[in-house]
Amino acid sequence: MTRTKNSSPIDSLVESEPVRDAARALIDAVQREASDRTLSPESYQKCIGELEQMRGRPLMFPMLTSGAGKGARVRMADGTMKLDFIGGIGVYAFGHNDEDLLEAAVVAAAGDAVFQGHLMPGPEAVRLSRALLRHTGERLKHVWLALSGAVANENALKMIFQKHTPADKIIVFERGFHGRTMAMAELTDRPAFREGLPLTGNVLHVPFYDPEDPESTDKTLRALEDHLRRFPGQVAGMCFEMIQGEGGFRTAPREYFVAVMELCKEAGVAVWVDEVQTFVRTGELFAFRRLELDEWVDIATAGKLLQGSATIFTEDYNPRAGLVAGTYAGSTVGMAVGTRIIERLEDEGYLGEEGRISLLGRRIQRHLQSLAKRMPEAIGACVGTGAMQAFVPWNGAPDVVKAVLEAAFEDGLILLGAGSNPGKIRMLPPVSTTDAVSYTHLTLPTICSV
Protein backbone atom coordinates (compact mmCIF):
# COMPACT_ATOMS: atom_id res chain seq x y z
CA MET A 1 0.00 0.00 0.00
CA THR A 2 1.49 3.34 -1.05
CA ARG A 3 2.09 5.70 1.84
CA THR A 4 1.96 9.46 1.82
CA LYS A 5 5.50 10.81 2.07
CA ASN A 6 6.50 13.90 3.99
CA SER A 7 9.68 15.23 5.55
CA SER A 8 8.59 15.48 9.17
CA PRO A 9 10.90 13.61 11.58
CA ILE A 10 7.85 12.72 13.63
CA ASP A 11 6.80 10.36 10.83
CA SER A 12 10.23 8.79 10.27
CA LEU A 13 9.58 5.50 12.11
CA VAL A 14 6.36 4.59 10.36
CA GLU A 15 7.85 5.55 7.00
CA SER A 16 11.04 3.53 7.47
CA GLU A 17 11.25 0.73 4.90
CA PRO A 18 13.40 -1.58 7.10
CA VAL A 19 10.92 -1.18 9.96
CA ARG A 20 7.99 -1.92 7.68
CA ASP A 21 9.75 -4.98 6.22
CA ALA A 22 10.26 -6.33 9.74
CA ALA A 23 6.61 -5.63 10.57
CA ARG A 24 5.45 -7.50 7.49
CA ALA A 25 7.61 -10.51 8.40
CA LEU A 26 6.09 -10.63 11.88
CA ILE A 27 2.55 -10.33 10.51
CA ASP A 28 3.17 -13.18 8.07
CA ALA A 29 4.49 -15.42 10.84
CA VAL A 30 1.55 -14.70 13.14
CA GLN A 31 -0.99 -15.31 10.40
CA ARG A 32 0.62 -18.62 9.43
CA GLU A 33 0.41 -19.78 13.03
CA ALA A 34 -3.16 -18.51 13.45
CA SER A 35 -4.37 -20.36 10.37
CA ASP A 36 -3.12 -23.65 11.84
CA ARG A 37 -4.81 -23.23 15.21
CA THR A 38 -8.41 -24.41 15.39
CA LEU A 39 -10.45 -25.42 18.42
CA SER A 40 -12.45 -28.62 18.29
CA PRO A 41 -16.24 -28.14 18.46
CA GLU A 42 -16.19 -29.31 22.08
CA SER A 43 -13.37 -26.96 23.10
CA TYR A 44 -14.98 -24.09 21.21
CA GLN A 45 -18.28 -24.47 23.05
CA LYS A 46 -16.46 -24.92 26.36
CA CYS A 47 -14.56 -21.65 25.88
CA ILE A 48 -17.76 -19.80 25.01
CA GLY A 49 -19.49 -21.23 28.07
CA GLU A 50 -16.58 -20.29 30.32
CA LEU A 51 -16.53 -16.73 29.01
CA GLU A 52 -20.29 -16.39 29.49
CA GLN A 53 -20.00 -17.69 33.04
CA MET A 54 -17.22 -15.21 33.85
CA ARG A 55 -19.22 -12.36 32.29
CA GLY A 56 -22.32 -13.33 34.21
CA ARG A 57 -24.54 -13.42 31.14
CA PRO A 58 -24.62 -14.95 27.65
CA LEU A 59 -22.95 -13.45 24.61
CA MET A 60 -25.35 -11.93 22.11
CA PHE A 61 -24.04 -14.42 19.54
CA PRO A 62 -22.23 -17.62 20.62
CA MET A 63 -18.92 -16.92 18.91
CA LEU A 64 -15.20 -16.48 19.48
CA THR A 65 -13.09 -15.07 16.68
CA SER A 66 -9.68 -16.48 15.84
CA GLY A 67 -7.89 -13.30 14.83
CA ALA A 68 -7.91 -14.48 11.22
CA GLY A 69 -10.02 -13.37 8.30
CA LYS A 70 -10.00 -10.99 5.38
CA GLY A 71 -12.16 -7.97 4.66
CA ALA A 72 -15.73 -8.61 5.73
CA ARG A 73 -14.99 -12.30 6.28
CA VAL A 74 -13.90 -13.37 9.75
CA ARG A 75 -12.77 -16.80 10.90
CA MET A 76 -14.16 -18.19 14.13
CA ALA A 77 -11.91 -20.04 16.56
CA ASP A 78 -13.50 -23.33 15.46
CA GLY A 79 -12.48 -22.70 11.85
CA THR A 80 -15.87 -21.67 10.48
CA MET A 81 -16.16 -18.46 8.45
CA LYS A 82 -18.75 -15.73 8.80
CA LEU A 83 -19.44 -12.50 6.98
CA ASP A 84 -19.20 -9.61 9.42
CA PHE A 85 -21.53 -6.78 8.41
CA ILE A 86 -21.46 -5.12 11.81
CA GLY A 87 -17.67 -4.73 12.11
CA GLY A 88 -17.38 -5.02 15.88
CA ILE A 89 -20.25 -2.48 16.07
CA GLY A 90 -18.65 -0.23 13.52
CA VAL A 91 -14.93 -0.25 14.31
CA TYR A 92 -13.42 -2.17 11.36
CA ALA A 93 -12.80 0.41 8.65
CA PHE A 94 -11.35 -1.88 6.00
CA GLY A 95 -12.45 -5.18 7.49
CA HIS A 96 -10.49 -7.89 9.23
CA ASN A 97 -6.74 -8.40 8.83
CA ASP A 98 -6.12 -5.45 6.55
CA GLU A 99 -2.40 -5.80 5.85
CA ASP A 100 -1.67 -2.09 5.74
CA LEU A 101 -3.40 -1.41 9.07
CA LEU A 102 -1.73 -4.43 10.67
CA GLU A 103 1.60 -3.01 9.56
CA ALA A 104 0.83 0.34 11.21
CA ALA A 105 -0.28 -1.49 14.36
CA VAL A 106 2.86 -3.64 14.60
CA VAL A 107 5.19 -0.65 14.19
CA ALA A 108 3.29 1.27 16.88
CA ALA A 109 3.18 -1.73 19.22
CA ALA A 110 6.97 -2.03 19.10
CA GLY A 111 7.34 1.46 20.53
CA ASP A 112 7.77 2.60 24.11
CA ALA A 113 4.23 2.51 25.50
CA VAL A 114 1.04 0.51 25.04
CA PHE A 115 -1.05 3.54 26.00
CA GLN A 116 -0.47 7.28 25.80
CA GLY A 117 -1.74 9.84 28.22
CA HIS A 118 -2.31 13.56 28.36
CA LEU A 119 0.76 13.98 30.58
CA MET A 120 3.15 12.18 28.22
CA PRO A 121 1.83 12.04 24.63
CA GLY A 122 3.88 10.65 21.77
CA PRO A 123 4.19 11.28 18.03
CA GLU A 124 1.10 9.15 17.35
CA ALA A 125 -1.07 11.63 19.27
CA VAL A 126 0.33 14.50 17.20
CA ARG A 127 -0.29 12.71 13.91
CA LEU A 128 -3.84 11.66 14.80
CA SER A 129 -4.83 15.12 16.05
CA ARG A 130 -3.37 16.70 12.94
CA ALA A 131 -5.24 14.27 10.67
CA LEU A 132 -8.56 14.93 12.41
CA LEU A 133 -8.24 18.70 12.24
CA ARG A 134 -7.78 18.52 8.47
CA HIS A 135 -11.49 17.64 8.32
CA THR A 136 -13.17 19.77 10.97
CA GLY A 137 -13.49 23.11 9.19
CA GLU A 138 -12.33 26.56 10.26
CA ARG A 139 -14.25 26.89 13.54
CA LEU A 140 -13.32 23.65 15.31
CA LYS A 141 -9.66 24.29 16.08
CA HIS A 142 -8.95 22.01 19.04
CA VAL A 143 -9.07 18.26 19.67
CA TRP A 144 -8.97 16.24 22.89
CA LEU A 145 -8.30 12.52 22.49
CA ALA A 146 -9.87 9.83 24.67
CA LEU A 147 -10.59 6.10 24.71
CA SER A 148 -14.31 5.44 24.21
CA GLY A 149 -17.01 7.43 22.48
CA ALA A 150 -18.85 7.79 25.78
CA VAL A 151 -15.80 9.48 27.34
CA ALA A 152 -15.54 11.86 24.38
CA ASN A 153 -19.21 12.71 24.91
CA GLU A 154 -18.63 13.19 28.65
CA ASN A 155 -15.84 15.65 27.85
CA ALA A 156 -18.11 17.52 25.43
CA LEU A 157 -20.84 17.75 28.06
CA LYS A 158 -18.42 19.08 30.67
CA MET A 159 -17.07 21.71 28.27
CA ILE A 160 -20.60 22.87 27.53
CA PHE A 161 -21.64 23.08 31.18
CA GLN A 162 -18.46 24.94 32.15
CA LYS A 163 -18.95 27.48 29.37
CA HIS A 164 -22.62 28.05 30.20
CA THR A 165 -22.55 27.80 34.01
CA PRO A 166 -24.86 28.01 35.96
CA ALA A 167 -27.10 26.49 33.25
CA ASP A 168 -27.54 22.81 34.11
CA LYS A 169 -29.85 21.35 31.46
CA ILE A 170 -29.16 19.65 28.15
CA ILE A 171 -31.60 18.95 25.30
CA VAL A 172 -31.49 15.71 23.31
CA PHE A 173 -33.65 14.01 20.71
CA GLU A 174 -36.08 11.22 21.43
CA ARG A 175 -34.64 7.77 20.53
CA GLY A 176 -31.10 9.07 20.72
CA PHE A 177 -28.11 7.12 22.03
CA HIS A 178 -24.96 8.69 23.46
CA GLY A 179 -23.15 6.07 25.55
CA ARG A 180 -23.30 4.02 28.73
CA THR A 181 -21.64 6.14 31.42
CA MET A 182 -23.91 7.56 34.12
CA ALA A 183 -24.38 10.87 32.34
CA MET A 184 -24.68 9.40 28.85
CA ALA A 185 -27.19 6.79 30.04
CA GLU A 186 -29.47 9.65 31.06
CA LEU A 187 -29.00 11.42 27.73
CA THR A 188 -29.83 8.16 25.95
CA ASP A 189 -33.57 7.74 25.38
CA ARG A 190 -33.65 4.04 26.30
CA PRO A 191 -35.09 3.50 29.81
CA ALA A 192 -33.93 -0.14 29.82
CA PHE A 193 -30.33 1.07 29.53
CA ARG A 194 -30.55 3.04 32.79
CA GLU A 195 -32.74 0.77 34.88
CA GLY A 196 -32.02 1.36 38.56
CA LEU A 197 -29.84 4.41 37.96
CA PRO A 198 -30.56 7.71 39.74
CA LEU A 199 -31.47 10.53 37.34
CA THR A 200 -30.71 14.23 37.64
CA GLY A 201 -33.82 15.41 35.79
CA ASN A 202 -31.70 17.83 33.78
CA VAL A 203 -32.17 16.11 30.39
CA LEU A 204 -34.95 17.45 28.17
CA HIS A 205 -36.28 15.73 25.04
CA VAL A 206 -37.62 16.93 21.70
CA PRO A 207 -39.01 14.77 18.87
CA PHE A 208 -36.71 13.89 15.98
CA TYR A 209 -37.56 14.40 12.32
CA ASP A 210 -40.35 12.26 10.88
CA PRO A 211 -40.35 12.12 7.06
CA GLU A 212 -44.00 11.01 7.11
CA ASP A 213 -45.14 14.11 9.00
CA PRO A 214 -45.13 17.43 7.08
CA GLU A 215 -45.27 19.28 10.41
CA SER A 216 -42.29 17.44 11.86
CA THR A 217 -39.90 20.42 11.83
CA ASP A 218 -42.49 22.68 13.45
CA LYS A 219 -43.15 20.09 16.17
CA THR A 220 -39.46 19.93 17.02
CA LEU A 221 -39.15 23.71 17.09
CA ARG A 222 -42.25 24.08 19.27
CA ALA A 223 -40.93 21.52 21.75
CA LEU A 224 -37.55 23.27 21.82
CA GLU A 225 -39.16 26.68 22.30
CA ASP A 226 -41.28 25.27 25.12
CA HIS A 227 -38.21 24.01 26.97
CA LEU A 228 -36.43 27.33 26.52
CA ARG A 229 -39.49 29.19 27.79
CA ARG A 230 -39.93 26.92 30.82
CA PHE A 231 -36.25 27.03 31.77
CA PRO A 232 -34.93 30.49 30.84
CA GLY A 233 -31.15 30.68 31.09
CA GLN A 234 -30.96 27.08 32.32
CA VAL A 235 -30.33 25.23 29.04
CA ALA A 236 -26.61 24.88 28.33
CA GLY A 237 -26.60 22.90 25.08
CA MET A 238 -28.32 20.58 22.66
CA CYS A 239 -26.93 17.30 21.33
CA PHE A 240 -27.54 16.22 17.74
CA GLU A 241 -27.05 12.93 15.91
CA MET A 242 -26.93 13.45 12.14
CA ILE A 243 -28.13 9.85 11.85
CA GLN A 244 -29.63 8.15 14.88
CA GLY A 245 -27.59 4.95 15.07
CA GLU A 246 -29.22 2.97 17.87
CA GLY A 247 -32.44 4.83 17.10
CA GLY A 248 -32.91 3.03 13.79
CA PHE A 249 -30.70 4.95 11.34
CA ARG A 250 -33.19 7.80 11.21
CA THR A 251 -31.90 11.00 9.64
CA ALA A 252 -33.16 14.42 8.57
CA PRO A 253 -32.58 16.88 5.72
CA ARG A 254 -30.19 19.79 6.06
CA GLU A 255 -32.98 22.36 6.35
CA TYR A 256 -34.33 20.61 9.43
CA PHE A 257 -30.99 20.74 11.23
CA VAL A 258 -30.45 24.37 10.17
CA ALA A 259 -33.81 25.42 11.62
CA VAL A 260 -33.16 23.70 14.95
CA MET A 261 -29.54 24.87 15.20
CA GLU A 262 -30.53 28.44 14.36
CA LEU A 263 -32.98 28.45 17.25
CA CYS A 264 -30.26 27.12 19.55
CA LYS A 265 -27.92 29.90 18.48
CA GLU A 266 -30.57 32.56 19.00
CA ALA A 267 -31.08 31.25 22.53
CA GLY A 268 -27.36 31.05 23.32
CA VAL A 269 -27.44 27.25 23.50
CA ALA A 270 -24.36 25.23 22.48
CA VAL A 271 -24.66 22.98 19.42
CA TRP A 272 -22.99 19.62 20.00
CA VAL A 273 -22.89 16.91 17.32
CA ASP A 274 -22.36 13.31 18.42
CA GLU A 275 -20.62 11.56 15.50
CA VAL A 276 -19.31 8.53 17.37
CA GLN A 277 -21.09 6.10 15.02
CA THR A 278 -21.45 8.29 11.92
CA PHE A 279 -17.72 9.13 11.85
CA VAL A 280 -16.51 8.33 8.28
CA ARG A 281 -19.56 6.22 7.40
CA THR A 282 -21.59 8.88 5.57
CA GLY A 283 -18.86 9.54 3.00
CA GLU A 284 -17.07 12.31 4.90
CA LEU A 285 -15.24 12.09 8.18
CA PHE A 286 -17.98 14.21 9.75
CA ALA A 287 -21.60 14.06 8.63
CA PHE A 288 -22.23 17.64 9.79
CA ARG A 289 -19.69 18.83 7.22
CA ARG A 290 -21.33 16.72 4.52
CA LEU A 291 -24.51 18.67 5.31
CA GLU A 292 -22.57 21.97 5.40
CA LEU A 293 -23.52 22.76 8.99
CA ASP A 294 -20.07 24.01 10.00
CA GLU A 295 -21.12 27.52 10.99
CA TRP A 296 -23.49 26.29 13.71
CA VAL A 297 -21.46 23.49 15.34
CA ASP A 298 -19.54 24.29 18.54
CA ILE A 299 -18.43 20.80 19.56
CA ALA A 300 -18.29 17.44 17.76
CA THR A 301 -17.33 13.99 18.97
CA ALA A 302 -15.92 11.05 17.00
CA GLY A 303 -15.24 7.40 17.77
CA LYS A 304 -15.53 3.79 16.57
CA LEU A 305 -13.72 3.84 13.18
CA LEU A 306 -11.24 6.25 14.76
CA GLN A 307 -9.94 3.35 16.92
CA GLY A 308 -10.36 5.62 19.91
CA SER A 309 -12.36 8.79 20.39
CA ALA A 310 -12.03 12.55 20.20
CA THR A 311 -13.80 15.73 21.24
CA ILE A 312 -13.30 18.56 18.75
CA PHE A 313 -14.26 22.09 19.79
CA THR A 314 -14.05 25.81 19.07
CA GLU A 315 -11.89 28.27 20.97
CA ASP A 316 -14.96 29.44 22.91
CA TYR A 317 -15.35 25.98 24.44
CA ASN A 318 -11.68 25.43 25.25
CA PRO A 319 -11.95 24.26 28.88
CA ARG A 320 -10.03 25.62 31.82
CA ALA A 321 -7.23 23.46 33.18
CA GLY A 322 -8.45 20.52 35.24
CA LEU A 323 -11.86 20.00 33.66
CA VAL A 324 -10.87 17.29 31.19
CA ALA A 325 -7.89 15.04 31.77
CA GLY A 326 -7.28 11.39 32.61
CA THR A 327 -4.54 8.79 32.61
CA TYR A 328 -5.24 7.56 29.09
CA ALA A 329 -5.67 9.52 25.87
CA GLY A 330 -5.77 6.31 23.86
CA SER A 331 -3.71 3.31 22.85
CA THR A 332 -0.56 3.88 20.83
CA VAL A 333 -1.72 1.26 18.34
CA GLY A 334 -5.19 2.79 18.11
CA MET A 335 -3.76 6.24 17.41
CA ALA A 336 -1.42 4.93 14.71
CA VAL A 337 -4.12 2.86 13.03
CA GLY A 338 -6.67 5.68 13.29
CA THR A 339 -4.26 8.03 11.55
CA ARG A 340 -3.57 5.50 8.82
CA ILE A 341 -7.30 5.00 8.25
CA ILE A 342 -7.75 8.73 7.68
CA GLU A 343 -4.77 8.86 5.31
CA ARG A 344 -6.17 6.04 3.20
CA LEU A 345 -9.64 7.54 3.13
CA GLU A 346 -8.05 10.72 1.79
CA ASP A 347 -5.73 9.04 -0.71
CA GLU A 348 -7.82 6.16 -2.07
CA GLY A 349 -11.01 7.88 -3.20
CA TYR A 350 -13.33 7.00 -0.34
CA LEU A 351 -14.66 10.47 0.45
CA GLY A 352 -17.18 12.71 -1.30
CA GLU A 353 -20.50 12.24 -3.05
CA GLU A 354 -18.87 10.08 -5.73
CA GLY A 355 -16.41 8.43 -3.35
CA ARG A 356 -16.28 4.73 -2.62
CA ILE A 357 -18.28 4.99 0.61
CA SER A 358 -21.18 6.82 -1.03
CA LEU A 359 -21.13 4.42 -3.98
CA LEU A 360 -21.19 1.44 -1.60
CA GLY A 361 -24.23 2.86 0.14
CA ARG A 362 -26.08 3.40 -3.11
CA ARG A 363 -25.30 -0.16 -4.25
CA ILE A 364 -26.61 -1.66 -1.02
CA GLN A 365 -29.73 0.50 -1.25
CA ARG A 366 -30.42 -0.68 -4.79
CA HIS A 367 -30.11 -4.32 -3.78
CA LEU A 368 -32.30 -3.89 -0.70
CA GLN A 369 -34.96 -2.13 -2.76
CA SER A 370 -34.77 -4.90 -5.36
CA LEU A 371 -35.30 -7.50 -2.64
CA ALA A 372 -38.16 -5.45 -1.20
CA LYS A 373 -39.94 -5.66 -4.55
CA ARG A 374 -39.49 -9.44 -4.58
CA MET A 375 -40.42 -9.85 -0.90
CA PRO A 376 -42.58 -6.84 0.00
CA GLU A 377 -43.92 -8.38 3.20
CA ALA A 378 -40.51 -9.50 4.48
CA ILE A 379 -38.43 -6.42 3.67
CA GLY A 380 -39.95 -3.05 4.45
CA ALA A 381 -38.47 0.43 4.59
CA CYS A 382 -34.79 0.61 3.59
CA VAL A 383 -32.85 3.49 5.11
CA GLY A 384 -29.27 4.62 5.45
CA THR A 385 -26.38 6.66 4.12
CA GLY A 386 -23.05 5.35 2.90
CA ALA A 387 -21.76 2.49 5.05
CA MET A 388 -24.71 2.75 7.46
CA GLN A 389 -27.68 0.80 6.08
CA ALA A 390 -30.79 -0.76 7.60
CA PHE A 391 -34.16 -2.24 6.70
CA VAL A 392 -37.37 -3.21 8.49
CA PRO A 393 -37.94 -7.00 8.53
CA TRP A 394 -41.61 -7.96 8.29
CA ASN A 395 -43.47 -5.83 10.88
CA GLY A 396 -40.32 -4.90 12.79
CA ALA A 397 -41.55 -6.49 16.03
CA PRO A 398 -38.79 -7.33 18.56
CA ASP A 399 -39.30 -11.09 18.26
CA VAL A 400 -39.13 -10.87 14.46
CA VAL A 401 -35.90 -8.83 14.55
CA LYS A 402 -34.41 -11.35 16.99
CA ALA A 403 -35.42 -14.28 14.78
CA VAL A 404 -33.91 -12.69 11.66
CA LEU A 405 -30.64 -11.93 13.46
CA GLU A 406 -30.40 -15.50 14.72
CA ALA A 407 -31.21 -16.93 11.29
CA ALA A 408 -28.60 -14.68 9.71
CA PHE A 409 -25.97 -15.79 12.21
CA GLU A 410 -26.71 -19.45 11.57
CA ASP A 411 -26.42 -18.76 7.84
CA GLY A 412 -23.02 -17.13 8.33
CA LEU A 413 -23.95 -13.44 8.40
CA ILE A 414 -23.42 -11.18 11.45
CA LEU A 415 -25.94 -8.33 11.73
CA LEU A 416 -27.45 -6.27 14.57
CA GLY A 417 -30.78 -4.68 15.32
CA ALA A 418 -31.51 -0.98 15.72
CA GLY A 419 -34.51 1.13 16.64
CA SER A 420 -38.00 0.18 17.74
CA ASN A 421 -41.58 0.57 16.53
CA PRO A 422 -40.50 -0.70 14.03
CA GLY A 423 -37.20 -2.40 14.73
CA LYS A 424 -34.65 -2.63 11.94
CA ILE A 425 -31.78 -4.83 10.84
CA ARG A 426 -28.65 -2.72 10.57
CA MET A 427 -25.43 -3.13 8.67
CA LEU A 428 -22.09 -1.41 9.34
CA PRO A 429 -19.92 -3.09 6.69
CA PRO A 430 -16.27 -2.29 6.04
CA VAL A 431 -16.12 0.76 3.77
CA SER A 432 -13.97 -1.23 1.34
CA THR A 433 -16.23 -4.25 1.02
CA THR A 434 -17.89 -5.57 -2.10
CA ASP A 435 -19.25 -8.62 -0.26
CA ALA A 436 -21.96 -6.53 1.40
CA VAL A 437 -23.77 -6.22 -1.91
CA SER A 438 -23.53 -9.70 -3.39
CA TYR A 439 -23.93 -11.65 -0.17
CA THR A 440 -26.96 -9.77 1.13
CA HIS A 441 -28.59 -10.26 -2.27
CA LEU A 442 -28.16 -14.02 -1.97
CA THR A 443 -28.71 -14.45 1.77
CA LEU A 444 -31.42 -12.04 2.89
CA PRO A 445 -34.22 -13.87 1.05
CA THR A 446 -33.33 -16.96 3.10
CA ILE A 447 -33.01 -15.34 6.50
CA CYS A 448 -36.07 -13.13 6.01
CA SER A 449 -38.24 -16.17 5.36
CA VAL A 450 -38.18 -17.07 9.06
Where do the language-model regions lie?
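Conserved N-terminal phosphate-binding loop of PLP-dependent enzymes in the Aspartate aminotransferase
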Residues: 2-442, 449
